[in-house]
Amino acid sequence: MGSVDVLREITPLSPEDCFLVMQRPKRSFSYPLHVHPEFELNYLENAAGAIRIVGDSVEEMEELDLLLVAGGAKHAYSNHKCLSTDILEITIQFHASLLIVLSTSVISRL
């Protein structure tokens, strides 16, 4: 069985950033298999029929799609059966430490 290349993405999120928001209109939605240490929340509009791959999971996306990718998780996207040329992608990237801060804040209010 052949090996699959996994790209190590260097995100624009700096250690000093709390989070980073990127809004990108796209004519197609494909991205090779990659990994990065940051968590990523992806919201997509008009990408029905595209495929998302996270770890061993392969799923076809709906018209509206929301996906949380854990830091270190291998993931990719493929246009597959997506016919739209008017795709909106909004990505929020953040460090795992933000989850710790938020969960500590919520627990302290209980």
Named regions from a protein language model:
Residues 1-60:
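Generic protein-terminus/edge-of-domain signal
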Residues 2-13, 66-110:
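A hydrophobic/aromatic-rich effector-binding and dimerization subdomain
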Residues 55-71:
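Short acidic-glycine-tyrosine-enriched beta hairpin
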